[in-house]
């Protein structure tokens, strides 16, 4: 039961990251490009993707 909960957590986390990426892509089409010195648009999804990969490697 515990392993199933962990796998469900990972699947939900990956789905949230995928949705965030799609949402940002759609928002990026409407918005002007950020300045080259601003990495705010890529920091949050990169952080969650890194955490998801580390968690996946740790648990599986």
Swiss-Prot record:
Contains 4-hydroxyproline; hydroxylated on Pro-32, Pro-34 and Pro-36. A lipid is attached at residue 38 (GPI-anchor amidated serine). It is a lipid-anchor; GPI-anchor. The keyword Cell membrane applies. The lineage of its organism: Eukaryota, Viridiplantae, Streptophyta, Embryophyta, Tracheophyta. Disruption phenotype: Formation of abnormal long root hairs. Proteoglycan that seems to be implicated in diverse developmental roles such as differentiation, cell-cell recognition, embryogenesis and programmed cell death. Involved in the regulation of root hair elongation. This is Arabinogalactan protein 14. It comes from Arabidopsis thaliana (Mouse-ear cress). The modification 4-hydroxyproline is found at residues 32, 34, 36. Glycans are attached at residues 32, 34, 36. Residues 1-28 form the signal peptide. InterPro entries: AGP3/12/13/14/21. It is found in: Cell membrane. PANTHER family: ARABINOGALACTAN PEPTIDE 1, ARABINOGALACTAN PROTEIN 13-RELATED.
